[in-house]
Amino acid sequence: MISLRPPATEWEVAWKANNEAHPLVNDWRFIGVGLAVNSVSEAASYYATLGFEPIDEPSIDTSLSMQRQGIQVGPLVFEFCQPVGKNSYCGDALNRRGEGVFDLVFQVKNLADETARLESHGLKKIACTDEQSACFDTRAEGNTLLRLVA
């Protein structure tokens, strides 16, 4: 790719290095969103008409009381989530503001370290179905859940 932007100045290089060394900067990679929907099958069917195919079959996540199915949209995954049962974070999001984003998903290099770091900052970890992910209730701060995956 050809860039028309001039090379970074010495000051810009130093500024970037300083900011990257900050303890709150992390190497998380944004990989997708969880979307609260009224019907996983209808949402997946609609996206299929747009040319986006499911990356998995619908499944039930008993720890978060929801049905989910992922769709690859370019480099991101849209995971459609439908509440199942009464105590569902997804259902809470639907009741509060209707269909839309309720979960931000990031890939991390060391799940145990990042989980410990977030818990040390006071974030509440909520149940997840496997050892490859950790969910945090950040609704008070950002009106979404935060999910880290290994």
Where do the PLM segments sit?
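Phosphate-end processing signature that detects enzymes handling 5′-triphosphorylated RNA
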Residues: 1, 87-91
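Short consensus segments that form the blades of beta-propeller domains
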Residues: 24, 94-95
